[in-house]
């Protein structure tokens, strides 16, 4: 361990790999507190679809950056990095170990490496104007929205598929906030780490992972995911960027009478599997991870391996 830098444990892996359980049990062992590294769990009222940890599952372990924003608020890697850095300082100063657990690769990467991310913070009045401008675009379909983006940021439009409404909206929002083009934004990575980091990943065969994902979607639906999405739509959040998350965007057409339920569920499972594949590609290609094979290691074996690495 490098005594000159704060020590943190980071647990990554694809959706449904078991990060929540491992992080909680590890926190019990090493006197830790957990910081969520998930871009969607920051939102209130989006509990089932984001697989948000329940109070019962927390089992007394403090969790941070969960349910802190409304669904119509925006959140970025910059804001995550700023909040997480403050939390790491606070947790460390109290003699505990920060454990960051999540699957949003850019968030994790921006935290542990020296990424220079642009501050998109705006005043409440400015944010209100941005939201009004975005609301004025709600009536546009995906192709029309994509064409709107291309009018002022052709480079971003070329790199974003028209059907990826969330990314298109993100590029438009960035322009509204900063008066700059997202395609021109520079993200600088220094080759030094901010922390003494133990980076742990959970992996398993694709067959096993996909089976776990399909099963988890069924459990989410049994626990009321459809009703959760209905309530968010009824509260006026349908057009928010947060509602483009997997688990929400697939069910909105059912609520609006544009798709049958069974087809939406199949889409939800497929999108979740595709997302998991992208997550694994990101972590394997962009980060140096110590991988633990969930199929051949029990929870206790994984915990023993991690604590051995710490010592």
Swiss-Prot record:
Cofactor(s) recorded in Swiss-Prot or TrEMBL: Mg(2+)
Domain of life, per lineage: Bacteria
Record keywords: ATP-binding, Magnesium, Nucleotide-binding, Transferase, tRNA processing
Enzyme Commission designation: 2.5.1.75
Claim: tRNA processing is one of the keywords in the record: yes
One Pfam short name: IPPT
Binding positions (ATP): 13-20
Membrane-spanning ranges: none
Subunit structure: Monomer.
Described function: Catalyzes the transfer of a dimethylallyl group onto the adenine at position 37 in tRNAs that read codons beginning with uridine, leading to the formation of N6-(dimethylallyl)adenosine (i(6)A).
Record's protein name: tRNA dimethylallyltransferase
Originating species: Staphylococcus aureus (strain MRSA252)
